Curated annotation (Swiss-Prot):
It is an enzyme of class 2 (transferase). Its main location: cytoplasm. The lineage of its organism: Bacteria, Pseudomonadati, Pseudomonadota, Gammaproteobacteria, Enterobacterales. Pfam families: CheW (PF01584), CheY-binding (PF09078), H-kinase_dim (PF02895), HATPase_c (PF02518), Hpt (PF01627). This is Chemotaxis protein CheA. Keywords: ATP-binding, Chemotaxis, Cytoplasm, Kinase, Nucleotide-binding, Phosphoprotein, Transferase, Two-component regulatory system. The modification Phosphohistidine is found at H48.
Length: 654
């Protein structure tokens, strides 16, 4: 049975992505004056592994690019080339082009020829300069790059026998073919599950292992030195050779493999399917629990006890499955050291980036959606927040600005903060700009309320538009995207001191801790993280305002009242506030009182997408299935107050 090596493409793509990310992280912290040997070795190993895999799968453009970079890295780690900032920048640029080449191969396309020619010429030029050769040698760069240095070729090594054992059906012929692509094989011996051949001494064992490990494991590969003599001896029996393999190599491989973390790659679609099935199981368990609660405990005690155990097991299973989708914030944070470094250099600023809480976990779907909003906030802090070095010195600050990205869990939420010690927000300029755009403003507004004006559509106080920011099309999009994820944005700023933008998000979109409330015969779910408290209002605490609006006084704070029955036109609800219950909700830094008929209870619900199953409903974010099989709507807390205001204004105009 033949085996198609293209079956292993995805494995190479996944590993190459990880290796390129590791390479970038090491390059960003590499000190050119005194480079750390371990970091240089790690960068070299990453390039070496990518080159080997690219050669195996015939990705010649990526292989050649990586080969040129690998040679330079080898010279640097041997101390034959002195690093500087320009060289590290070139390595980072090479990494970017390698990523573009890899992405092209993923799409079954050929990489861009112009960028390939450009980066190859740049790397070859650097190689010439490192050797002290003149730029006039460019005419023969291609020959120089593709041929190994003469002194290295002269270092002949003894031929070696490679022994591959425990092979699967089809792998014997496949691996023989792949080895033939790397070098010339002699004295080939093939068994049912083994392969043996003599290799010339001009190819490194690491190169061979790097290629073969995309198909088999490292402990299936053994090398033996073959003594050079006029007469080639008969190859040893494969099984015996495997048993008599050099002890040191076997022990080293076992040690290496024992230190590796055991993990498998699973498609996200399979995880999502598993989560959906567990969600259905939880709903079924909830239905059974509701039915069993109606039974007589005396006659059905064992059944009720078993139902309690089932509930605990279902909850544990749900939490375990949900944890599979959780990813560390490091996945997001890892892209910002490069962004800050490049953008700060472009703007002529000095910035030190600090990352806090990289191990904090968040649902994969939210991780992917938070990248763009967070990137905009980081760019905004660099462009508008942190000042130029001379301005910072004039203000009595350190010339190096500080930018902090942090993440931490707060209950069932994650709090992500972007903090800078820059100029802060200019209250007067924001108010003037807001007034000129027709926004409702007042001098009595608090600093936090003024700061939230920057999230208005089209709002920008930038004196000039740059390719970094300044068009006013970003901050409102940031806010809307965060709200779509079930979160909200807060901002705190002090002029001359700095700004902190805080993003609060639920840990997952699949499970929700909610408070169920009743309005007439309808049941609604309020996200528990938005619920502050609940109370029954007194007539003395209710105060009318112009336009039919009422506010509720709670410990000296006046909160607008939103009547849920009015928002969704629910018939038969309690219309008098003193007869119902108000739930104090907080969203987007603002609080209001939501009038409902009755509180039912607090529980976890499985979130079902309403838009894909029905249509988008203003004021409703999703739906869920209750224990009795009925459907309850999950309220969009951030949208309710605005909908209530629009309805009241429409009624007044009519």
């Amino acid at each position: 049975m033949s085996m198609d090596i293209s079956d292993f493409y995805q494995t190479f793509f996944d590993e190459a992505d990880e290796l390129l990310a590791d390479m970038e992280q090491h390059l960003l912290v590499l000190q050119p004056e005194a480079p750390d040997a371990e970091q240089l070795n790690a960068i070299f190993r990453a390039a070496h592994s990518i080159k080997g895999g690219a050669g195996t799968f015939g990705f010649s453009v990526l292989q050649e690019t990586t080969h040129l970079m690998e040679n330079l890295l080898d010279e640097a780690r041997r101390g034959e080339m002195q690093l500087n900032t320009d060289i590290i920048n070139l390595f980072l640029e090479t990494k970017d082009i390698m990523q573009e080449q890899l992405d092209a191969y993923k799409q079954s396309q050929e990489p861009d020829a112009a960028s390939f020619d450009y980066i190859c010429q740049a790397l070859r030029q650097l190689a010439l300069e490192a050797k002290g050769e003149t730029p006039s040698a460019v005419t023969r760069l291609s020959v120089v790059a593709k041929s190994e240095p003469q002194d290295e070729q002269s270092r002949s090594q003894s031929p070696r026998r490679i022994i591959l054992s425990r092979l699967k059906a089809g792998e014997v012929d496949l691996l023989e073919e792949e080895l033939g692509h790397l070098t010339t094989l002699t004295d080939v011996v093939k068994g049912a599950d083994s392969l043996s051949a003599i290799l010339p001494g001009d190819i490194a064992e690491d190169d061979i292992t790097a290629v073969l490990c995309f198909v088999i494991e490292a402990d299936q590969i053994t090398f033996e030195t073959v003594e050079v003599s006029p007469k080639i001896s008969t190859p040893p029996v494969l099984k015996l050779a495997a048993e008599q393999a050099p002890t040191g190599r076997v022990e080293r491989e076992k040690t290496t493999r024992s230190n590796e973390s055991t993990s498998i790659r699973v498609a996200v679609e399979k995880v999502d399917q598993l989560i959906n099935l567990v969600g259905e199981l939880v709903i079924t368990q909830s239905m059974l629990a509701q039915r069993s609660s109606e039974l007589d405990p005396v006659n059905h005690g064992d059944l009720i006890t078993s139902m309690g155990q089932l509930q605990r097991n279902a909850r544990d299973l749900q939490e375990s499955v949900m944890s599979i989708r959780m990813m560390p914030m490091e996945y997001v944070f890892s892209r910002y050291p490069r962004l800050v470094r490049d953008l700060a250099g472009k703007l002529g600023k000095q910035v030190e980036l600090t990352l806090v809480g990289s191990s904090t976990e968040l649902d994969k779907s939210l991780i992917e959606r938070i990248i763009d909003p967070l990137t905009h906030l980081v760019r905004n802090s660099l462009d508008h927040g942190i000042e130029l070095p001379e301005k910072r010195l004039a203000a009595g600050k350190n010339s190096v600005g500080n930018l902090i990205l942090s993440a931490e869990h707060q209950g069932g939420n994650i709090c992500i903060e972007v903090t800078d010690d820059g100029a802060g927000l200019n209250r007067e300029r924001i108010l003037a700009k807001a007034a000129s755009q027709g926004l409702t403003v007042s001098e009595n507004m608090s600093d936090d309320e003024v700061a939230m004006l920057i999230f208005a559509p089209g709002f920008s106080t930038a004196e000039q538009v740059t390719d970094v920011s300044g068009r006013g099309v970003g901050m409102d999009v940031v806010k809307r995207n965060i709200q779509k994820m079930g979160g909200h944005v807060e901002i705190q700023s002090k002029q001359g001191t700095g700004t902190t933008i805080r993003i609060l998000l639920p840990l997952t979109l699949a499970i929700l801790d909610g408070m169920s409330v009743r309005v007439a015969d309808e049941v609604f779910i309020l996200p528990l993280n938005a619920v502050m408290e609940s109370l029954q209002p007194r007539e003395a605490d209710l105060h009318p305002l112009a336009g039919g609006e009422r506010v509720l006084e709670v410990r000296g704070e006046y909160l607008p009242i939103v009547e849920l029955w009015k928002v969704f036109n629910v018939a038969g609800a309690k219309t008098e506030a003193t007869q119902g219950i108000v739930v104090i909700l907080q969203s987007g830094g603002r609080r209001y009182a939501l009038l409902v008929d009755q509180l039912i209870g607090q529980h976890q619900v499985v979130v079902k997408n309403l838009e894909s199953n029905y249509r988008k409903v203003p004021g409703i974010s999703a739906a869920t299935i209750l224990g009795d099989g009925s459907v309850a709507l999950i309220v969009d807390v951030s949208a309710l107050q605005a909908i209530n205001r629009e309805q009241r204004m429409a009624n007044t105009a009519a």
